[in-house]
Amino acid sequence: MQAMSIRIFLILFILILIYPSASPAATERRIALIIGNSAYSSGTLKNPVNDAAAMASQLQKLGFTVILKKNANLRGMEDALTDFGDRLKRGGVGLFFYAGHGLQVGGANYLVPIGARINRESDIRYETLDAGKILDEMANANNGLNIVILDACRDNPYSRSFRNAARGLAIVSNAPVGTFVSYSTSPGKRSP
């Protein structure tokens, strides 16, 4: 695992240890959706699929039920999110991990699936997964602890051509109570 992934895992491990319902008796209430997208037509990213697989393996050791998607298109990401939402249970722990391309437009974060065709700003809402949908699923479950880890702050290839695009990802301000959001870099910045 990369150094950043190890840091994320350590933070995650500490959160799970200190959260009361994360005891061994509550392991059936831990659900994680892990998505790693590497095989983009604009160029393959080296680490996302490997990081997703490593994170899934570690979470399974911590008693999570894991939904793992590698190189998912939009439909695959949406179906996985629906499955994740259906499995979340009140009082449990929900975790979402994404590694791949992400972008910020108009203050909202979007996760870029494999096969996305984004030629103009208006394509974003039809060709990407709005990160707000993940928070909506978590809010609907009313879990005591939600963890969102976004390793998606790479260069936004559209930031120069789209009026409302910005570098990096936006700060999440509408997360449900009890939600921990972690980025691979500071909001508004990009990672190498």
Identify the meaning behind each predicted range.
Residues 1-5:
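N-terminal secretory signal peptides that target proteins for export/translocation
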Residues 8-19:
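Bacterial N-terminal signal peptides
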Residues 19, 106, 175-177:
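Short, solvent-exposed loop/turn segments at the edges of secondary structure
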Residues 22-27:
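Boundary at the C-terminal end of the N-terminal hydrophobic targeting segment
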Residues 29, 72-99, 103-161:
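Caspase-like (clan CD) cysteine peptidase catalytic core
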Residues 29-37, 41:
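Mature N-terminal segment immediately following signal peptide/propeptide cleavage
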Residues 36, 43, 48, 56-59, ...:
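Active-site-proximal C-terminal subdomain of hydrolase catalytic domains
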Residues 47-89:
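N-terminal, post-signal-peptide region of Sec/Tat-exported proteins
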